[in-house]
């Protein structure tokens, strides 16, 4: 199908001039954040440099301009201060949290324990799910998408008296499915089936919706509206709003009070009186007044670039534009097929783009190979990035829709967690099943050429043309065909260097003993990663198991030797519950080595259940060597060097022609491992472990690996040793693998049936 153009040629050209910085970049993550226009930022600069804006508690000029912004926001949503109060927050998440913290679930005359209900749609953002942790009621219930409309009652009951709250999104941020906003008044008037005594109020998450749609609060009137401004304008970030319907503010019982929110307060006697006006009562302290003022230029930019036309408001025209783009993308992707006729794209949509009333400007999908297996979303996103196509991959902080679309139960999700899968990681495949998806989200400045580039990239990189790469002949003897564990690499400190073991290494319940047992954290308790701090590779830890000491080396530092039996293990408020601080001596050494102040070393306790065990990466050395010329000493040296780049734990010798993607479980001696995903090739592999730098040689060698598309490694989860007395993993012996067809092999030809993987 052809793209249906909403903008005139002049409007499209004017918009393109605002985003010259994009050049050949194709930005398709407007669901995460849209982009700011160049003239918008220039106008903000001019406004700030031409005026002196002081604290609004002092400056009358600043306060007046902030009030003008409030009126502008309300007018943008077709309402005014007689219908809604506006409270500035740090974003939609903070707005949702404010409602959750302060909503009163008990009527004034109700008995103790006689409380209302908190009901939420499962297809909500994580920030809504987080409300469950702090709402003032124990009656917390989820609703499935397909049951949502059915739960509406036919008529109201006179017994409705318990204040209750229902939360749902105007538009699903996962795939832009829209919910009928007519439900708002129906729920307020009629309630929900099974909640006869509950008087429901509606909290509407519009963060995704208002980014590319017009929200008409004169027509649809939820009690609470939560939003972020950067989703609409790109700038400023860190600013959102909570809009409260008049009359509903009485349901919020605010406890804390900060500067500027009280009429009187006594420092001795515990007495205070809050302001009555919601914006004065709820906006604690000094608001980000410069960011608030900057919103004016966001509104001006949208109205200037996309003026109302043919009876449609600016944001209604944006809605038409992104819907047309998404529909065009949906059909273009849907037409892709492999040479054998198999579909290339699996969609995760709740509509087929029949109506703009029910669908917004997002297309969510995964790529399929010609055999029907999936391309991992993380691998896809990285390849797309190499082609300057910027997308979002994962579950987009919407586990409810992600589970529903991937057909993953709560029990299945928990099983993935036990295998090491956590939110935000790159573990995109488990047992051949995707753990997330790819999202293309469109904004007002997106062009059809951006969609064309996405489709072209998929056609170039993922669509099979029926030409297979011949298998390279091998000169290895049959003895070399056996599967053998050659070496073990231990990484005591996450994102730092490793040491090699060629004999044996002890195993514990969580896997390899001491592997990723420590993390370097900053003053906020956030772990450092080599992907952002490449010089972490220069710190090489080694553990001597006989004396139980940790030895740290660095090119510019004297070695530091720490006795693990006497290591300080103090609890710290900045660290997770299952971690302890390792003391000042090692903290000072690490801070000096990395040239960053106030770093600490955290030790992760093995007896907690707060975090999953680290995944074990198995690398096939033969597969790496197969990438180059067998007779080239340089190529084979590069292959050995790449083993360290991939930061594998177990280096095995398996035939390069073996398809590791068919492996299901592995047994090495008495120790069993479950395959939980293929190597996702994270950015840390570009870092030279010897120098801690991203070198040209690294990029060249690894680009060659990716180009040949050879599966080089897989992630394993340690299952156990079946109660065996020997707790060490031995190098040098053969191992047994179970393939997905349930066959078990120790070499290419020899079948083995003696090992029981079920214990």
From Swiss-Prot:
UniProt keyword terms in alphabetical order: Molybdenum cofactor biosynthesis, Pyridoxal phosphate, Transferase
Protein name: Molybdenum cofactor sulfurase 1
Active site: residue positions: 397
A Pfam short name: MOSC_N
GO molecular function terms noted in the UniProt entry: lyase activity; molybdenum cofactor sulfurtransferase activity; molybdenum ion binding; pyridoxal phosphate binding
Keyword check for Transferase: yes
Originating species: Culex quinquefasciatus
Function noted in UniProt: Sulfurates the molybdenum cofactor. Sulfation of molybdenum is essential for xanthine dehydrogenase (XDH) and aldehyde oxidase (ADO) enzymes in which molybdenum cofactor is liganded by 1 oxygen and 1 sulfur atom in active form.
Modification sites for N6-(pyridoxal phosphate)lysine: 231
Record's catalysed reaction(s): Mo-molybdopterin + L-cysteine + AH2 = thio-Mo-molybdopterin + L-alanine + A + H2O
One GO term (biological process): molybdopterin cofactor metabolic process
Cofactor annotation: pyridoxal 5'-phosphate
Record flagged with keyword Transferase: yes
Domain MOSC: 591-738
Protein family membership: Belongs to the class-V pyridoxal-phosphate-dependent aminotransferase family. MOCOS subfamily.
Record-linked InterPro entries: Aminotrans_V_dom, MoCF_Sase_C, MoCo_sulfurase, MOCOS_middle, PyrdxlP-dep_Trfase, PyrdxlP-dep_Trfase_major, PyrdxlP-dep_Trfase_small
EC number: 2.8.1.9
